[in-house]
Each structure stands twice: as structure tokens, then as C-alpha cells.
Amino acid sequence: MTQVPVILMPQNTCRATLAFAASCLLASLAICDNAHATLMLPTDALDANLTADVPACHRYDGLQPQGTTSVPISTCETLSPDLGKFRASLTDNGWWIEGGTFLGGTFDLLNHAAHPQLYIGQDPTYRANTYVYITYDLSRIGFAGASQLVFNANVQAFSYAGENPTGFAINSLYISQRFNDGREQVQYGFDELGNQFYGFSLGTNSTTSPAGVGSSIPYEVGFIFNKSAPEINLRLASHDTHFYDRFGVTRSVDPQGPQADWDANNFWGLKWHIPGAGPLYINELGYQLDAQPQQHMMWLRQGVIYNASRFTGFNGGYADGNYAYYMVGDYQLFQTDSTQPYRGFYINAKADYAPPDRNVFAGDIGATFYVLGPFDRPYDVLALGYTYNQLSRSFEHMREASGYTAVDFSRNYALSYVYRLGRGVYLSNQLSYTVNPIPSPKQAPALTWMSSLSLSY
């Protein structure tokens, strides 16, 4: 229910970012002398009730985007894993393709309709998205390491303009190279950096995530979304791959907010520079364990974000830069199926902070209990979450001085369930209660119902 606020930042440049990205790109190309590596294939177990055409899909999954925190659904879980042998032919030539369609709506059950609409669901709110993911194994043409070209594009539509822009966008167009069994990874090109940091999805992939880890702060401080931005990030892991450090540089979102960023970008979403959008730096330290028999899943991470752009201060004047700090953790409390160790009860906890003199959302804490594979349904997800947002009192006082009402906190309670209707078809429902759904003007508590249908193919 919480909206990402509009962020005002004066003009800056990305010259330092672009120089760094260019130097890393040249270094990467310099080591591509006839090297060849095979992408590692996943070893997750098959569901016994899947049809005979499914086993080959594990081979296709080996070409899925590597190293992202927003993992596409397994090819085994699409409507047609083999696509009439089309995927087999693509895989033989180093290609992988997957697509999907998402349809959803949000409705206020307390009938708080308003004109103009002020938040998602206040009036009936609808959204639709169709996307395609394509990868190519670049090690076949001499790139060093396990190398991929990753492309992701979508067409999206929203009935409420305040939720997101409507139109076409390329969300990802980058090269990823992994070395030493994935312990070193470099990625460069165009992407939404939020796909590589923080971990906004709950569950085993982005499709089955019922609610995700919600926080406005990384986007308020400058994470880009909807379209992409030039970026480079480097991930280094320990010998056992459990400890890691990841550093990234990208262009900040446009100073006028997400709609202005969309409008200032070109049709493809691949514009190198947008006036006023300076470089954004992020570093994340983490510890990660996958769910295995006798081993519970654990993912702990903390990160620092710094945006070199100038921000408008709520107390007058400007602030030279902006920053945020986050801590997020997921832990599998216990497993419910030894043959499918990912199934079980989990907890997610998170905390975020940003300085209140230049950010409307100054801090948040939250916890979500979720179950992967409840009720003898291995692909369903159940989640119960709570989030408390501390809002800027400087912003509150500024709005009140202008004659508007404002609040200094919000609370959200959410119950979600993702139901697998069939292979590649998921129905998600969420009931959410929010106290103070927007910072200003003050609104009555909102009780919203969100439903969505996702198709993967």
C-alpha cells in the first residue's frame, strides 16, 4: 500500500560512474581470449506429478540469469517446459527464453474512493504486465568465465498513474561473468540495480513471492525502477561461497521522480545520462546458506547506499547527497519435507534508515512469517507480515506550515496467499490493513484486497 515518494534532486553528473564502468568493461574484454566455460546446472528436485516432458527443463534452467536476487520461475514450472522442442533447440545453441503475463487489481474494502485518487487501491486500481527474458551463453564466443548476455523487456499498464508509468521498457541489457565456480562475478550494462541487491522477493522465485520485502527507502534514495540505467557491480564470495561482498555503481533515478525518469529516458529505456541524476553507489555484505537436508536456509545482508545527487532539504536549502542503510535477514525456522528441503516455515526481518531532513520515509522495521509449501501443496506460499514506517517530522512540519495535514508514521498488516492453479499459473491474494496510507494529506485507515494472476511460459 505504501507509495514510493517523489524525490527532488538538483542536477549532477555520472562521469565518475561511467569512467569506472568503461575501465571494467575493457579489463573484462581483455581476458576473453578464447576462454570457454559451461554454465552450472541447478539440481533442484522435480515434482513427481509433472508430465514426461519436464526432466529436460533442468538443462534449460542452467541458462537462466545468474547471480540475481529476483530469480525467474523455473522453466519446469512454465505452461510448456519444452515449447514443442523449441527450448531444446535454443539451448543447443546457447539461448534461453522465458516470458510471462501478470494481471492484477487492488480494491479498498472500506469504500474510501476519492477524486483525485491519492493511493493505490483507494479507487479500484488495475495493472497488467507482459515480459520476456532472454539469455545467451557468451562463453561460446570467447568470453572468459561463465558468461551471459541478459535481456529483459516488458510492456506495462496501470490505471492509476501514481503507481507506475505505462508503456514499453527494456529493464535489463547486461553482461554477467562468473569465475572460480561463481565466487567472483562482474556484471556491466543496463539494469535495475534493485534486482542485484537487498532481496525484495520472498520465496524461491519472483513469481511465487506473495508480498515481498517492502521498503520505500532504497527507491526514495535513488534506486531506479521501471526502466534501466547504466550500471556495474562486482560480487566476491568466500571459498565456501557463504560470505560475500557486493559493490555496485549506477545512475540515480531522475530528480523529479519515477514518472519524470520514465519521460526523460528514451523509448528503449537505455539513455546513458539524464540531467540531474547523479551516480549512486551501494555496498552489501552478506552470509547465505541454501536449504538442504539437515541445513536450514539463511540469508543475512546489510548494505549502505550513497547518492551523490543534491537533494532538496525540508528545512530549507539543499543537501549534498543522500544515503541509506539497511539490514535484512531470512531464516528457515524448520523444514516440513526432507525430500524438498526448501519447504518449511521462515521468518524475514528488516530495518531501513535514511536521514529525515531530506527523505519522507526516514526509517522502517518489519517482520514477515511465511511458509513455502503449506498444506501438502509444495508450490503454494503463505505469508503474514507487519511493517512500521517512521516518517519525517521535518516533512510533516513543512506540510502543516503550508496548510496541509500530515502524519509522522504508518503501519501495515498483510496476509497473503499464493495458490498454484496449475503448472505456470498462479493466483495471489492479499488482505492488507494500513494506518496512514500516505504521508500527506492524512487519510483514514485503508483495508485493501489485492488479487493477481500470473502466467509463465
Where in the sequence are the language-model features?
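N-terminal periplasmic/intermembrane-space "pro-region" immediately following the signal or transit peptide
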Residues: T2, I7, C32-G104
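Detector for outer-membrane/organellar transmembrane beta-barrel domains
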Residues: D290-E400
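Outer membrane beta-barrel
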Residues: D123-D254, N359-G366, G373-M398
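Outer-membrane beta-barrel "beta-signal"
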Residues: P445-Y457
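Transmembrane beta-barrel strands of outer-membrane/channel proteins
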Residues: G99-F107, L149-V155, V186-E192, D245-R251, ...
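Membrane-embedded beta-strands of outer-membrane beta-barrel proteins
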Residues: V132, L173-I175, I232-L234, N283-L285, ...
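Short loop/turn motifs that connect adjacent beta-strands in outer-membrane beta-barrel proteins
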Residues: T38-L41, S74-I97, L109-L110, T135-L149, ...
